[in-house]
Design a protein with these regions (language model features):
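Hydrophobic beta-strand anchors of alpha/beta hydrolase catalytic cores
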Residues: 64-65, 92, 138
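Thiol/disulfide oxidoreductase modules built on the thioredoxin-like
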Residues: 6, 110-114, 121-167
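Structural microenvironment flanking redox-active thiols in thiol-disulfide oxidoreductases
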Residues: 76-111, 122-129
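Short, conserved active-site loop motifs that form the nucleotide-linked donor/cofactor pocket
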Residues: 90, 116-117
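N-terminal targeting signals for export/organelle localization
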Residues: 1-46
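Conserved SAM/SAH-binding loop
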Residues: 45-50, 122-124
Length: 174
């Protein structure tokens, strides 16, 4: 019994230290931010308007992928900021998530389309493969790899603190 107590006295403080070190060393300032690097999953889907086939091989360079849907209220809130980014020359590809094609097209007509192209992910397969849990979500892509991801509305503060910081740290040009 004394042996077990001695071991516990030694192990418990180490476990507590490890827990707090791990928790405190994380950047918790933006809980929706994720900086895991991974390749864009392979996909075969269609473009929203023309219904032409698209795959991951059709996407190149540095750009944002914005996951959105016509039924998403927060997407409407975020939309004005995406227009601002698009008008400043930032390439944005829309990933229309679990949405009816005609509803999505009508939504973009009503609120204007900031996207270079829109992938219609009607059943959410690509979004699921990318780890999407809902809309909106935005991914920063560099040469086929996700280098930053934000769950939730992107606004000026998130843009600067999450995406611009990653762009500068990675030395990429959008």
């Amino acid at each position: 019994m004394k042996q077990i107590l001695k071991i516990l006295v030694f192990i418990v403080p180490i476990c507590i230290f490890a827990f707090f070190y791990t928790y405190l060393s994380k950047d918790n300032s933006y809980p929706g931010a994720d900086y895991r690097v991974f390749e864009i999953p392979s996909f075969d889907l269609t473009e929203l308007y023309q219904k032409t086939e698209l795959s991951n091989e059709d996407l190149s360079g540095n750009f944002l992928i914005n996951v959105w849907a016509s039924w998403c209220i927060t997407c409407r809130v975020e939309h004005g900021f995406l227009e601002k980014l698009s008008n400043s020359g930032i390439r944005i590809i829309g990933l229309n998530y679990k949405d009816d094609r005609s509803d999505a097209i009508e939504w973009l007509k009503k609120y204007r389309d900031p996207y270079e192209l829109v992938i219609h992910d009607f059943n959410g397969s690509l979004a699921l493969d990318m780890g999407v849990t809902g809309a909106p979500e935005t991914f920063l892509i560099s040469n086929g790899k996700v280098i930053a991801h934000y769950r939730g509305e992107v606004n000026q503060i998130i843009w600067e603190d999450v995406f611009i910081k990653t762009i500068k740290d990675s030395e990429i040009i959008l």
